[in-house]
UniProtKB/Swiss-Prot annotation:
GO terms for biological process: amino acid biosynthetic process; aromatic amino acid family biosynthetic process; chorismate biosynthetic process. It comes from Allorhizobium ampelinum (strain ATCC BAA-846 / DSM 112012 / S4). The lineage of its organism: Bacteria, Pseudomonadati, Pseudomonadota, Alphaproteobacteria, Hyphomicrobiales. PROSITE patterns: CHORISMATE_SYNTHASE_1 (PS00787), CHORISMATE_SYNTHASE_3 (PS00789). PANTHER family: CHORISMATE SYNTHASE. Its EC number is 4.2.3.5. This is Chorismate synthase. Keywords: Amino-acid biosynthesis, Aromatic amino acid biosynthesis, FAD, Flavoprotein, FMN, Lyase, NADP. It is an enzyme of class 4 (lyase). It catalyses: 5-O-(1-carboxyvinyl)-3-phosphoshikimate = chorismate + phosphate.
């Protein structure tokens, strides 16, 4: 199975399976001389790791990242990138492959089981292999490296919808995101989501969600017209996350409901002699090129396919079966997708940052 790499100058390859001994990433193209500590990477993995609340999978993984290459250790305990490939590894320590024995020959409705088997003639039924959300741990580690490439850029994500329950944007407070198990920026939605997900869990079911990622401090001029648009690459990386079914930038599909006067971001010259935008409906990107305004992306995540509810399906022999999935699964995988979305946006921006620096010499 190919297509495990993405990026041009900042290039990432992820490897490993949900129930293998380990998984990880190789980051190629990171500039030399960037100083960081292991904690600078671990903080992002700690946001994504399972078992932190009753609303996510109870699989227990410490998700401790190891840096195997591409750095020089320093006397103060930090590391400096050398410019060679950075290899990152995260060990799997809490697999229960026996939970999947009953579905070894059965296809879970809504899952990649059928299409993987159809295309390759083999699939890793133990947790889904590469189609598992577990694969995203490697992306988050790579995203930690990508952030090192982006001076002055802040990338933050939040959960804005679970099922039909949306946040009130008037209550948006970034300081609240790390104070609840949902990464919710609206503290008033937290008890609503708690009650709702408790019901979903008791039913043995799952539900979808929407994540919003905002990147601030992105320099104007990243991206290129037509086939190298910044929003094109951000969208592609967000769509590559397992379970993502839709992505929008700025107003996104909402732009189809308003007029040109309402949608256009008008401009004026600021007191400092620099142009300013009076709104940001475009989500920080025009013509595939960043404007300097915050980049805003949202993505929709489908409900987890592995649920306890009995459903109709077929097996690998073409027989009709009724299937119920055992094991430990996220009732709402969108919760842990927040740091994954941040990582994907970071990787896209790092790649375009280096491409712009190489092509125009504007950025240092």
């Amino acid at each position: 199975m190919s297509h495990n790499s993405f990026g041009h100058l900042f290039r990432v390859t992820t490897w490993g399976e949900s129930h293998g001994p380990a998984l990880g990433a190789v980051v190629d193209g990171c500039p030399p001389g960037l100083k960081f500590t292991l904690e600078d990477l671990q903080v992002w993995l700690d946001k994504r790791k399972p078992g932190q609340s009753r609303f996510v999978t109870q699989r227990r993984e410490d998700d401790l990242v190891k840096v195997l290459s591409g750095v020089m250790p320093q006397d103060d305990g930090s590391m400096i990138t050398t410019g060679t490939p950075i290899s990152l590894m995260i060990e799997n320590t809490d697999q229960r492959s026996k939970d999947y024995g009953e579905i070894a020959q059965q296809y879970r409705p809504g899952h990649a089981d059928y299409t993987y088997d159809l295309k390759y003639g083999i699939r890793d039924y133990r947790g889904g292999g590469r189609s598992s959300a577990r694969e995203t741990a490697a992306r988050v580690a790579a995203g930690g490296i990508a952030r090192l490439v982006l001076p002055g850029v802040t990338i933050r994500g939040a959960l804005v919808q679970i099922g039909t329950h949306k946040i009130d944007r008037a209550n948006w407070d970034w300081s609240e995101v790390d104070n609840n198990p949902f990464f919710a920026p609206d503290p008033k939605i937290v008890p609503v989501w708690e009650d709702y997900l408790d019901q979903i869990r008791k039913q043995g079911s799952s539900v979808g969600a929407v994540v919003e990622v905002v990147a601030e401090g992105v320099p104007a001029g990243l991206g290129a017209p037509i086939y190298a648009k910044l929003d094109q690459d951000i969208t592609a990386l967000l769509m590559s996350i397992n379970a993502v079914k839709g992505v929008e930038i700025g107003n996104g599909f909402g732009a189809a409901e308003i007029t040109g006067e309402e949608n256009a971001d008008q401009m004026r010259m600021g007191n400092d002699g620099q142009p300013i935008f009076l709104s940001n409906h475009a989500g920080g990107i025009l013509g595939g090129i960043s404007t300097g305004e915050p980049i805003v992306a949202r993505f929709a995540i489908k409900p987890t396919s592995s649920i306890l509810t009995e459903r109709q399906s077929i097996d690998s022999q073409g027989r009709n079966v009724d299937i119920r999935t055992k094991g430990r699964h996220d009732p709402c995988v969108g919760i842990r997708a927040v740091p994954v979305g941040e990582a994907m946006v970071a990787c896209a921006l790092a790649d375009h940052y280096l491409r712009d620096r190489g092509q125009t010499g504007r950025l240092k």
